[in-house]
UniProtKB/Swiss-Prot annotation:
Subunit structure: Part of the 30S ribosomal subunit. Forms a loose heterodimer with protein S19. Forms two bridges to the 50S subunit in the 70S ribosome.
Xref: NCBIfam families: uS13_bact (TIGR03631)
UniProt GO molecular function: rRNA binding; structural constituent of ribosome; tRNA binding
Disordered as annotated region, ranges: 95-122
Classification via Pfam families: Ribosomal_S13
Family membership: Belongs to the universal ribosomal protein uS13 family.
Biological process terms in GO annotation: translation
Primary role: Located at the top of the head of the 30S subunit, it contacts several helices of the 16S rRNA. In the 70S ribosome it contacts the 23S rRNA (bridge B1a) and protein L5 of the 50S subunit (bridge B1b), connecting the 2 subunits; these bridges are implicated in subunit movement. Contacts the tRNAs in the A and P-sites.
Keyword Isomerase: no
Protein name: Small ribosomal subunit protein uS13
One GO CC term on file: cytosol
Organism, as annotated: Nitratidesulfovibrio vulgaris (strain DSM 19637 / Miyazaki F) (Desulfovibrio vulgaris)
UniProt keyword annotations, A-Z: Ribonucleoprotein, Ribosomal protein, RNA-binding, rRNA-binding, tRNA-binding
Gene: rpsM
Length: 122
């Protein structure tokens, strides 16, 4: 089992699919990495030699932010928005949609479960 960027890649999967198990790597980026390293995308992860795995690992470390570094950067960007008090930061702080979606109806995922209306006592 190959271990790249702290993630155990699944055995028996194609290399391009297995790379998508790494946070921050999608199909397009996986194919770009394989093109740069010269590894055939249709091969199984089990069939890769140690040199090929090391080359993929080296390419990821040099040219891509993945896993913890990427998560840290995203959270620091959101924290920066909240600290400077811009509109997007306020929306993050209040737990509302950030990109201009309507909130009168919908936005339940972002807002959480509905609060029940207070009923009239009999």
């Amino acid at each position: 089992m190959a271990r790249i960027a702290g993630v155990d890649l699944p055995r028996g999967k194609r290399v391009d699919i297995a790379l998508t198990y790494i946070y921050g790597i999608g199909r397009t980026t996986a194919l770009q990495i394989l093109d740069v390293t010269g590894v055939d995308w249709s091969r199984n992860i089990d069939d890769l030699s140690a040199d090929e795995v090391n080359e993929i690992r080296k390419e990821l470390e040099q040219n891509h932010k993945v896993e913890g570094d990427l998560r840290r950067e995203i959270s620091s960007n959101i924290k920066r928005l909240m600290d400077i008090g811009c509109y997007r930061g306020l929306r993050h702080r209040r737990g509302l949609p950030v990109h201009g979606q309507r909130t009168h109806t919908n936005a339940r995922t972002r807002k959480g479960p509905r609060r029940g209306a207070v009923g009239k006592k009999k």
